[in-house]
């Protein structure tokens, strides 16, 4: 199976996107601490777009303009069963809202698994679309974002700016 790779410019840096014909497998900032390792896990990666990557770019452009609150891009998770449950829960956090890691653990039915939840969030390979940036510390402080706290703050401010009830 071939994987397509495309770099997508955004207001906060280029995103590295990898997809096959069925869904998005990776979307991460090119300067993220995990991007190189994650890219190496895809063999036969070709530098060209496909319909999934074209949709990713289109929807990201709309998102950064405040014209898209929910992505329709099909995603393909790659992780443990627990990680996948954590990432599915992230998809339930609405645009413009945040929850704490503790609240996310409670929603998963594992209230004592706060560190495990935070660790799974840090291994989310599909930034922005799977919105781990919407999870903050219980004291409302910004913590833990593989792309960098400056990017997390930008994304939360962007969503807050365009958030309407």
Set out the residue ranges of the language-model regions.
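Basic nucleic-acid-binding alpha-helical/helix-turn surface characteristic of O6-alkylguanine DNA
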Residues: 1-112, 162-165
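LysM (lysin motif) carbohydrate-binding repeats in extracellular/periplasmic proteins that recognize
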Residues: 111-114, 155
């Amino acid at each position: 199976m071939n994987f397509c790779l495309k770099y997508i410019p955004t207001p906060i840096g280029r995103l590295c996107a990898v997809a096959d014909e069925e869904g998005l497998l990776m979307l991460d900032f090119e300067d993220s601490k995990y991007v190189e390792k994650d890219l190496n896990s895809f063999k036969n990666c070709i530098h060209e777009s496909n319909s999934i990557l074209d949709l990713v770019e289109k929807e990201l452009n709309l998102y950064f303009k405040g014209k898209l609150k929910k992505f329709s891009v099909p995603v393909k998770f790659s992780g443990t069963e627990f990680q996948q449950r954590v990432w599915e829960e992230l998809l339930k956090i609405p645009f413009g809202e945040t929850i704490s890691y503790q609240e996310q653990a409670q929603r998963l039915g594992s209230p004592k698994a706060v560190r495990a939840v935070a660790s799974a969030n840090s291994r989310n390979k599909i930034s922005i679309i799977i919105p781990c940036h919407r999870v903050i510390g219980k004291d409302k402080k910004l913590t833990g974002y593989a792309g960098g706290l400056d990017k997390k703050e930008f994304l939360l401010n962007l969503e807050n700016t365009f958030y309407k009830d």
